[in-house]
Amino acid sequence: SWGYNPNHFFAYDKAYGNRNLYKKFIDECHKRGIAVIIDMVFNHATGICPMAKLYWDGNSTAANNPWFNRVAKHPFNVFHDINHEYEGTRKYFKRVLEYWVEEYHVDGYRMDLTKGLTQKNTGDDAGKWSQYDASRIVIIKDYCDAAKSIDPETYFIIEHLGDYSEEKVYAEYGILPWRNMNNSYNQVAMGWASSSN
């Protein structure tokens, strides 16, 4: 599914029709000047994800599963927390990013909760989790490079909401941080400027 319960990252939800219809939809969007941005969720996956099932232990991923963390490294995790330090994970997700640009000609990605692409264990401390994380920067830049390897104009938008010093690194690299500013803009557009900041 494309939602917040991902399981197969090379497959879209059947509600989008078959492969040819989905490609036609994207082509029709492009004819009308509409960019197609896929919302990607790489920080977690459901238990039916093949990489979770490969190493399964009762109701959870097994302790020896290199793809997943048995216990989430950050406070906002749902389902199974993905280990992005594992080389197999990185290769897999880079190929996913290349695939959708190459095969379907999507224009880019909005990457959900990229702050969760970390192995730095902050437990339930959201403040620590938001701090500058050099290893996370390497991972996110690596994914951006993969997305842009097929088409350098590919949009790479991150929902990060972390420390400004970290987000500045991304912006200087050409990554587009989304800082949840749309609510204020919506307020102004609707004429409610007095309640926006």
PLM feature segments, named:
Residues 105, 133, 138-197:
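Conserved alpha/beta catalytic core and glycan-binding cleft of carbohydrate-active enzymes
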Residues 36-38, 109, 156-158:
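Hydrophobic faces of well-ordered beta-strands that scaffold small-molecule active sites
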Residues 1-105, 113-132, 143-149, 193:
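Substrate-binding/active-site clefts of carbohydrate-active enzymes
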